[in-house]
Amino acid sequence: MPTTTEQPRSMWDHYTVTIQFVGPLAAAIPKHPKAILAMLEHRQPARVPKNATPLPELAEQVAEEVGADEEAPVGYATFKSDEEGPYYEGRCIRGHLKDCALQVASFFPETKNFRAKFVNRVYVQTDKIPLFNRYGKERIKTFSGPELRFIQVMTAQGPRSSLKQVDYIDSPRIQFTLAVLADGVIGEEHLRRV
């Protein structure tokens, strides 16, 4: 067998992505323990895997990550935080990328089933994405403030209105790493459009 000094090509291309938000980034995770459990129940798959974490245990974990408070209004939303400050989750970025891939699919008519190909080739490598100030130099330690939002929903009993309190961070910057399968189907131009 011949020997070579050439390094094998990696299966993955890695990209560092920086996003500068213009305006507030609003939180989406409930702060009240009962609302956390209700959110998890709503998002639970129809077929729960045998080795899945039980919902009460998962709700307790999320409650700890958001600093849940029984006194918080049921409609209060906040961010997960660790000892260094609030953070965004990689799984949320992946969800945004999936939605965006659907929206820009028509830009790439030569790539059949663009969204499916994108979703199966692009992975967010960073689980906890810290939030930095707009200059990217300082980690954000606290929220910019809460905002009251008037919301309306249609229910079986008719339209309903309520107030929702949402923590927000003004114009944060985030940075994370994407791993893209290096098979030539999804490249930098696709990533820039998405």
Q: For each of these PLM feature ranges, what is it?
A:
Residues M1-V194:
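RNA-interacting cores
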